[in-house]
Regions:
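Short, intrinsically disordered, charge-balanced linker/junction segments flanking boundaries
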Residues: 1-8
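Cofactor-binding loop segments of dinucleotide-utilizing enzymes, especially the Rossmann-like FAD-
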Residues: 8, 174, 200-202, 333
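Glycine-rich active-site loop/strand segments that organize a redox cofactor
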Residues: 11-62, 139-140, 147-148, 152-159, ...
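Feature captures the FAD/FMN-dependent oxidoreductase FAD-binding
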Residues: 46-128, 239, 246-259, 265-268
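Glycine-rich dinucleotide-binding loop and its adjacent helix/turn
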Residues: 56, 123-191, 197, 293-301, ...
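A Rossmann-like FAD-binding core segment of flavoenzymes
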Residues: 81, 85, 187-291, 356, ...
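Glycine/Thr-rich phosphate-binding loops of Rossmann-like dinucleotide-binding domains
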Residues: 129-130, 279-280, 338
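C-terminal, flexible cofactor-proximal segment of oxidoreductases
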Residues: 272, 276, 293-435
Length: 435
């Protein structure tokens, strides 16, 4: 089965590289795909300590980068290949006769066009963060404050230290990205006098963010919430709850966030409100999306954060990921839409199932199995208060980034910002004048 991997970044796992300083909740034993391990073992690769928690940088350096350099993958990955659109040759979304026989057309940002018999969309959600506005659209004035708003997971104690030291920061959001940033800011505040922290959330009760504590089967994840709770109770973090941002503006050199008659001011705002999938690039394909989560309709009840935590999501694969457009599948974090209940191991099994189906091994494709650490920390239990989008796309470890294919089986999911295109017919590549 011929294939090509399209990576938008200049190197493997470009999105993870932006938060390489962050430690994952899941130890290595949950982070390495079995098919990827088989390929790496052929190169003399030394497996990391399976009980250790890797950082994003270690995930790249010890796993994803070596994987991308294996003989089976090295010549299959195209870097700097940002996907602009996916459609079918000669067909928009409306036209039907002969549709299934037409190849997919994948157009890159530089005008290059690639034909494919199937497309696995593992683009993730990192490039499409949610907005600060409390109604799902940007707050009034938000777009004009780019220089004062930073995206999730800044390197507070490292390369971004000067931006936060001795200044007031407002962290907006109630997910694990927000918790991680708040803890780093708390450490910075202990080192640098004058460092102030406000935590701005839409909900009324933060038990969901504080999580399972000692009951969490991923101890690092449970400890994260427990430490954050201590920071809030000590007064080092000012918790501003029930705050739905309506507008944002610059006043006397600081950002002013407004919710009704209430105001929050800060030198810098960290947008930790989560992420959402970008379906615009596949707008001409026929998708069956759940109207609430933005996942496939069949997958939605299995991952609903009102009913499930990360570890209680049942095994699922090609059947739940299929769309009315035969041959197109979204896997990984993108497949979950706005649900924050995603784990790396889930994406690995999704991708394995889809690749097995494309190879014609439907028995293997439907033999889906998952062994996940269970906890309530990723649920949106309504007893905890408002179930908003603040945690969307931000659950329980990183979006999957490794790609690995063996004959008929095995694919660790996702090249961030790119698209994995599986081709089982001769490849035709067309270039525009920009190519």
């Amino acid at each position: 089965m011929d294939f090509v991997v399209l990576e938008a970044g200049s190197a493997v796992a470009a999105a993870i590289d932006e938060w390489r300083h962050v430690k994952l909740f899941s130890p290595w034993r949950y982070d390495i795909d079995s098919a990827a391990r088989r390929l790496l073992e052929q190169t003399g690769w030394v497996e990391p300590d399976l009980g250790k928690l890797p950082t994003g940088g270690e995930l790249i350096d010890a796993y994803l980068a070596p994987l991308a350099k294996t003989p089976q993958l090295n010549d299959r990955i195209r870097y700097g290949a940002q996907v602009a659109a996916v459609t079918r040759v000669g067909f928009d979304r409306i036209r039907t006769p002969g549709r299934e026989q037409a190849p997919f057309l994948v157009r890159l940002a530089d005008g290059t066009e690639i034909l494919a018999s199937a497309v696995i969309d593992a683009a993730g959600t990192w490039r499409k963060p949610n907005v600060l506005g409390g109604s799902g659209i940007p707050a009034r004035g938000e777009a004009e404050l780019d220089g004062h708003i930073t995206r999730a997971l800044p390197d507070v104690l490292g390369r971004d230290r000067e931006r936060f030291a001795g200044r007031r920061t407002a962290v907006v959001g109630a997910g694990h990205s927000a918790a991680t940033t708040l803890l780093d800011l708390g450490e910075l505040a202990a080192q640098v006098p004058g460092t102030e922290i406000a935590w701005v959330v839409r909900g009324t009760d933060q038990a969901r963010t504080y999580g399972g504590g000692e009951a969490d089967e991923l101890p690092a994840r449970g400890a994260l919430g427990s430490r954050l709770k201590q920071l809030v109770q000590s007064g080092r973090v000012e918790l501003v709850s029930s705050f739905r941002i309506e507008s944002a503006s610059l006043k006397n050199g600081q950002v002013e966030l407004v919710a009704g008659e209430r105001r929050v001011t800060a030198d810098t705002v960290v947008n930790s409100t989560g992420f959402r999938p970008d379906h615009d690039i596949v707008a001409e394909l026929r998708l069956d999306l759940d109207p609430i989560l933005g996942s496939t309709r069949a997958l939605a009840p299995l991952i609903d954060p009102n009913q499930h935590s990360c570890g209680t999501v049942p095994p699922h694969g090609v059947d739940e990921l299929a769309h009315p457009e035969p041959g197109y599948y979204a896997v990984g974090a993108k497949s979950y839409g706005r649900a924050p209940t995603f784990l790396l191991a889930t994406g690995y099994e999704q991708a394995r199932s889809v690749v097995a189906a494309l190879a014609g091994d439907w028995a293997a494709a439907r033999d889906v199995q998952l062994d996940l650490p269970e906890t309530g920390v990723c649920s949106s239990n309504l007893a905890y208060g408002d179930s908003s989008d603040e945690t969307a796309g931000g659950c329980c470890g990183s979006a999957p980034q490794a790609v690995e294919v063996t004959t008929g089986r095995g694919l660790a999911t996702g090249i961030s910002g790119g698209l994995l295109t599986v081709i089982d017919q001769p490849t035709t590549t067309q270039s525009s004048c920009c190519g």
